[in-house]
Amino acid sequence: MQRPWRRALAVRLSIHLAFGAALPAQACWDDAAQRYQVSSALLYAIARTESGLNPQAIGRNGNGSRDIGLMQINSSWLPTLASHGINERDLFEPCINIHVGAWILAGNVSRLGYTWDAVGAYNATRPALRRAYADKVRRHLPAAIPAPAAPARRTTSASPR
């Protein structure tokens, strides 16, 4: 059974791709940001840092895991994502990938607060590596965007769908 959200996303994505756009529509960034209460500019900066905005990017890691798509979702998330009806092939769909990346970031924010440490945790577990990663992301933010500011208090723990 296909979920209505997924069907609507597929229709929007096919319309978007039919017009030859290289990147997901702004609505994908905004929808994910609103759903998971994170900044759309921050999501975009993470995607720029992770994949150079390439929705087909695949990164191979020294530990044997892979990073998939626009937001470079690590393959270690695949078992968890499968319980939400998302498989590896789905992660090459830019809007799905953005939503999953936003969900991961929101989990970090829930644990660490809306901080650069939470941004760094998107990519690294060690504090020094988190800081270095957050600095890379910060450089990809538009100049008018300040450091993460705390959004309204979270009231739900949404899934990546």
Language-model features: locations:
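N-terminal secretory signal peptides that target proteins for export/translocation
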Residues: M1-R6
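Bacterial N-terminal signal peptides
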Residues: A10-A21
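Catalytic glycan-binding domains that act on GlcNAc-containing polysaccharides
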Residues: Q26-R161
